[in-house]
């Protein structure tokens, strides 16, 4: 009798196990932590995550959730804002076709290759500080970019920014940048942070006519003449930026002439903050 009972139960148990496995396999989101956050946001705690359901995801904010794998996020085609800072992400290839993304925050992950975002043409804001990025050429054709935050990486070449005419905030502290020549072709930057780099020549900044904050602490700057000339010219003319400029300069090997140069900057309205 017991044997007969087990014989009847076994098919049922097998069916339950099979159903459970199918349910698990049905999820298009590989990372369980990411899946859990997506389910919370779209209010689908149970059941299969169909492509139709994933189209309801417009904003994904899940910082510090131990997320490692983005596989499956490519099905969230309507997503416009992604904030996944302070996770353990290394591969961002699943983002490559998410062309509706306008804001992307992946700070403090383990990302080295950003080529997959080269086609995100609506991107306006990118935050990738605290990663392992050395090549930023993927940004070159992202003409909608307004703000780039990529401090604490391994960047030495900033040529990619020379075509970004809408760029107003550029934050690249703690990198390996020495050549600012690409900045000579754009003129709408209001905030520029290049602290803790290897910059010596400020001449490429002479065409920046919208600057409000210039952070160049701890570089190799000995001569402020290009900045002085630019500010004096602005102050005696349109007064577009010099009277509003805040300058952070500490930790540079300033030469003997800089005492006079700093006085000239002050006379043009520039505030030296450090």
What are the functions of these language-model segments?
Residues 85-134, 142, 147-152:
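A generic tandem-repeat structural signature
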Residues 139, 146-209:
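Eukaryotic tandem repeat interaction scaffolds
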Residues 58-62, 82-84, 102-106, 124-128, ...:
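Conserved hydrophobic beta-strand positions in leucine-rich repeat
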